[in-house]
Amino acid sequence: MDIEVSRIISELYMNGDLLKESSCKCKNNTSVFLDDSSIDRVNCQRNNYKLQLNRVRLEYKSGKKKNDGIIINLPPEQIEGLTKESASKTIKALGTDVTFNYNDETTTCIVCSKEVQEIVVSLISLYYCHPIEILQKFCNKNNQLEVILKSQRRPFENIGSRINLHVKANDVIEFIKLANTEHSHIHDLPRYVRQYIDSFVVSEPQRFNMLFAMASSFAEYILEKGKMGGAQLVEETISYFNNIESLQKVKDTIVKANLRRNGKSISTITELRNECEHNLYSNESYEFFANNPSVNVFMYDIACKIVMKLAGIPTLSDTI
């Protein structure tokens, strides 16, 4: 099948029709669809083109049914030492059964209902503070097995996370069990978790901006405070988590730094955000956060409470 598919894909690419409702049928009752694909990379050797696609959908005509599931870039050893020889691990979580199976040394298969797949992945990402990716997704559809293959962006790294310092969970399984999906904003969790995790791989000025945006968005969309200004929205979020006293300490830190913009003193986190946006890569921005790490620690604590709130997981205390 690989040679046949490769030839058809190459011909479609040369004709400029690769991503225009492309599909091909193979001899073993398999159909390959590229309508949702995009090209990550193209390698050319003479007349042969090797394409790396970010997404491919397969459909198998088969009388056998397979439970809905996904394969993620999490080594199975992270699931209580799951191995090829060991039995699968099934837990009761998120109102359903979630089963973890060994796939290979670097990936784990999770069998659960489609409704909670992204939530499970987000919780695992949150626990490890690392973007967990869905590499394969399979489900039964119209008496066919549909499989979606996705390219991997980053290998798994167990870099540790402060998030597990705030909950009674010794491992990722316990962490997932603590989650509560019975609230109206549970499907917002993946978006906020991505923002939270992404904030760890940028500069400190960028991080401040991202965490500020998280706090603003939480007030506007989750607390439903409406179209306020950014400063008001962030203060609504901070007030919601009872951190007003800590906010005043951050304001005092900003005032003591004697930062100025257009001749005016910077004294609030909103004014600091505006300065960071306009002078993101300035020496002043880097020096401020290097000399005053408590500012981003405060913003991180608010972001941490946001994602924990959306996950339905109570923290060990009201103060992080």
How does the language model describe each region?
Residues 211, 227-231, 286-295:
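Composition- and surface-driven signal marking solvent-exposed, interaction-prone regions
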